Amino acid sequence: MPLFETIKHTYKHLWSDASTASFRKYPSPERPDILSIDILSKEIDPTTGVLKCTKLIICKGNTPSWLKSILGSGECLFYEETTVDPKNKIMTLKTKNLNFTNILGVDEVCTYEQHPDNEEWTLFTQEATVTSSIFGVARKMEAFCLDRFVANAGKGRKIMEDTIIKVQKEAEESLASFDKTFTSIKHEAEQSFEKAFSTAEDILPIIKLDDKQSQTTQNTQSNNNKKK
């Protein structure tokens, strides 16, 4: 019979920051067992704006000797499907193991959604289902995997918090850089305008003088013609 575990956590950060951080939280020194994450496909629905992404995750199997003798391989492969709905502010990640499926099944579903009580917070729900069919050690294997799930979930929350702060800091720095650039351009434009205006003020008397001299010349020529 499968074992289940559900964990809920509130991140006191905007959904946009949390969902962005979810894509960027690995690699992390807190989880050296996660060896690689490769994006297999990515597409955005032009009508709904929903992003769908698939990944291959390879983890180092830090398993006890009794479990290693059953599984054999030292690496675990996982397939993950991610769906991000920016309009409804919900992100869903579904993960399942690709190897050892005849011995052990691990399915995980994570959701990030705007908190129902505070739109500036994010509600995170993490659910795991572990199933084993090995006679005699099935329950022991399932319990071990769930314990590992709970331990890794705690590490994952810390990694998320750190990554969210990093995302927010980068956004602030980008905004500050934009403001600095905009201010610099505005200042240069004002200086150019002032210079052009100052030049115009210097040239205007000369133009007026040239016009006056030209008019005088024309009047003189006109008088001379009349005398003739």
Curated annotation (Swiss-Prot):
InterPro entries the UniProt entry points to: PRELI/MSF1_dom, Slowmo/Ups
MF GO annotations: phosphatidic acid transfer activity
BP terms from Gene Ontology: phospholipid transport
Domain PRELI/MSF1 residues, every copy: 1-172
GO cellular component terms, A-Z: mitochondrial intermembrane space
Family classification: Belongs to the slowmo family.
Protein name as it appears in the record: Protein slowmo homolog
Name of the coding gene: slmo
